[in-house]
Amino acid sequence: LGVSEYSNIEQTLTRYFGSARFSVTDAMHIIAGFNAIDFERTGQNAGAVIDNSESEASPYVGATYAVTEDVNAYVSYSDVYQPQEQYDVNGQYLDPTKGKNFEAGFKAQWFDDRLLTTFAYFTAEQDNLAAYAGTNPETLQYYYKGVSVESDGFEIELAGQLTDDLRINASYTNIDVEDEQGNDANLWAPRDVV
């Protein structure tokens, strides 16, 4: 008589966040804040005992500058901390993903605010991001490993109503994602989006 292995997991995620906005000049504003997580996960997964407890605070900061009445520049930075749902080869949850994001760009309004254009450049680094590593032949459960990836890209967008009969909404995004060895990573994610 065999014994069936099962999963019975209880998890609690509590987020705390706060921010403050400062006007440095009439044209320049700064926002700073944090996003904190208290995370607890206990139970059993296919025979493996699960007992995780994590707490982490991630800061972020950003600034905007009104170049003209219709053109604004911005820059932002944030830390990343995200618990994961994927298991490793031993049936344990992967440790959280940690990293940092940076973005800079412009937003401009044209034709009496009827057309909005944006351009953004972004880059991110993530450590311990879940990547498929195989299938357990006994349980048929997928397992994953944590990898480090770097991504960068840009986005261009046009949106607005130029006339009563002409509305435009167009965008293009390009992203490059590489692992520690410089190989393409996250191949499931599109590299060009129109």
Language-model segments: residues:
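Structural signature of Gram-negative outer-membrane beta-barrels, strongest in the C-terminal barrel
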Residues: 7-126, 173
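Gram-negative outer-membrane beta-barrel transporters
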Residues: 26-27, 144-194
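Conserved catalytic-core segments of large NTP-driven translation/proteostasis enzymes
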Residues: 135
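Extracellular loop and loop/strand-boundary signature of outer-membrane beta-barrel proteins
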Residues: 2-6, 19, 42-50, 86-93, ...
